[in-house]
């Protein structure tokens, strides 16, 4: 695969709604449409990592510039023809399942596994009972408490960080992660799921 080379990563910067329905196996999602720069730094960590971009037409220049601003100058370039070309050539693709807040509400009493990837301060203001908590910046290194054979509903505050987390977990062999669309904001506004307080 493209990312088997030592110290190389496939970084997909498209919108998460497009990413989840098809992406190159082992790629990491960090979309240009969200908090791109801080999460590149927090998630990729190693500024010497070689980066191959997957982007929409016209996004490459902006992505390379924004990577460079936070010290990631080792961009190998972007995939010619983008994801569409990759898929149309018959190469393997992955997907990530998603559920909206109302769908989560239907399953909430079925003993499902919920993973909260928000910061500690956000969680202190309210969280879902029995949810596990691993802040996004730690998901790559601190996932020992998770079980690869289980399905996890992953949420953040608004739905951007959770997709980053799902892509990292997928690369690590967690094949049943479900992204909760709209995150905790949507859960607290659109459902009657009980919110716990510390």
Q: Where in the sequence are the language-model features?
A:
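C-terminal accessory/connector segments of nucleic-acid motor ATPases
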Residues: 1-6, 15-19
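Rhodanese-like catalytic fold shared by cysteine-dependent sulfurtransferases
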Residues: 16-198
């Amino acid at each position: 695969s493209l990312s088997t080379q030592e110290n190389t990563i496939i970084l997909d910067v498209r919108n998460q709604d497009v990413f989840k329905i098809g992406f190159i196996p082992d790629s990491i999602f960090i979309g240009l449409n969200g908090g791109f720069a801080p999460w590149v730094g927090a998630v990729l960590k190693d500024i010497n990592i070689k980066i191959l971009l997957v982007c929409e037409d016209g996004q490459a220049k902006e992505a390379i510039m924004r990577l460079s601003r936070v010290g990631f100058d080792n961009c190998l370039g972007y995939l010619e023809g983008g994801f569409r070309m990759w898929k149309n050539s018959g190469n393997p693709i992955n997907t990530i399942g998603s559920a909206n807040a109302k769908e989560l509400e239907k399953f909430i009493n079925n003993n499902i596994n919920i993973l909260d990837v928000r910061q500690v301060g956000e969680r202190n203001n309210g969280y879902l009972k029995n949810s596990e908590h691993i802040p996004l910046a730690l998901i790559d290194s601190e996932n020992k408490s998770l079980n690869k054979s289980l399905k996890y509903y992953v949420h953040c505050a608004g739905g951007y960080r959770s997709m980053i987390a799902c892509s990292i977990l997928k690369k690590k062999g967690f094949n049943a992660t479900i992204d909760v669309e709209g995150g905790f904001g949507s859960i607290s506004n659109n459902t009657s799921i009980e919110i716990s307080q510390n």
